[in-house]
Amino acid sequence: MLSYLSGTLIEKFSTEIVVEVNGVGYLLNISATTHEKLPAIGNQIKILTYLYVREDALQLYGFITTEDREVFKLLIAISGVGPKLAQTILSGMSTAQLRESVIAGDTKALTAIAGVGKKTAERIILELKDKLVKLDLKIDIKETAFRSDKQQVRNDAYSALISLGFTKSIAEKAMRAAIAEVPDGSVDDLIRVALRHVQS
């Protein structure tokens, strides 16, 4: 199962994008919310994916955030809500707005979206209310773990600079510059950039 694609954004339209990975172009369906978060054509992109399997076709859906993908999966599990309507819903409101509407039981906000009738809105609220609360906790745990891993990488890079003989003030200044330049860099990336700033 594809979890994500990392490559070059070749084309982007209102509901579709093409990402090239190792010479292969992947067509992904996206929501308007995802479209707003895309980089410019030609830039590198890491996009989360969901493969929807039908009898006559395989369709890839793309998401910038874990939350968007998880909510999409919850939506298509509801009877009467297919991937097309799920994307329409995620285009009409953010996942945060959807969560607020569902928890508040606000059918009016949901029926304001094209294709969502009163019965569908009521079904969405009934089936998602508890699941969205649990999803929040699940995502918070994942993001906390990610932040912890990132902090450990930064701590290791800082310790390496100290072991190389740099003072704390110089190491801290170099690390701030390195983090600003490569916020998601590995230990080696951070050390390399930090050393460049120290030597400049």
Curated annotation (Swiss-Prot):
Record's keyword terms, sorted: Cytoplasm, DNA damage, DNA recombination, DNA repair, DNA-binding
Segments of this protein annotated with the region Domain II: 65-143
Stretches the record annotates as Domain I: 1-64
One family name in Pfam for this protein: RuvA_C
Compartments where found: Cytoplasm
Any one GO CC term of the record: Holliday junction helicase complex
Annotated stretches, region: Flexible linker: 144-148
GO MF term list: ATP binding; four-way junction DNA binding; four-way junction helicase activity
GO aspect biological process, one term: DNA recombination
Domain of life: Bacteria
Region (Domain III): 149-200
Role description: The RuvA-RuvB-RuvC complex processes Holliday junction (HJ) DNA during genetic recombination and DNA repair, while the RuvA-RuvB complex plays an important role in the rescue of blocked DNA replication forks via replication fork reversal (RFR). RuvA specifically binds to HJ cruciform DNA, conferring on it an open structure. The RuvB hexamer acts as an ATP-dependent pump, pulling dsDNA into and through the RuvAB complex. HJ branch migration allows RuvC to scan DNA until it finds its consensus sequence, where it cleaves and resolves the cruciform DNA.
Family note: Belongs to the RuvA family.
Domain-related comment: Has three domains with a flexible linker between the domains II and III and assumes an 'L' shape. Domain III is highly mobile and contacts RuvB.
Subunit comment: Homotetramer. Forms an RuvA(8)-RuvB(12)-Holliday junction (HJ) complex. HJ DNA is sandwiched between 2 RuvA tetramers; dsDNA enters through RuvA and exits via RuvB. An RuvB hexamer assembles on each DNA strand where it exits the tetramer. Each RuvB hexamer is contacted by two RuvA subunits (via domain III) on 2 adjacent RuvB subunits; this complex drives branch migration. In the full resolvosome a probable DNA-RuvA(4)-RuvB(12)-RuvC(2) complex forms which resolves the HJ.
Protein name listed in UniProt: Holliday junction branch migration complex subunit RuvA
Annotated source species: Chloroherpeton thalassium (strain ATCC 35110 / GB-78)
Gene (name only): ruvA
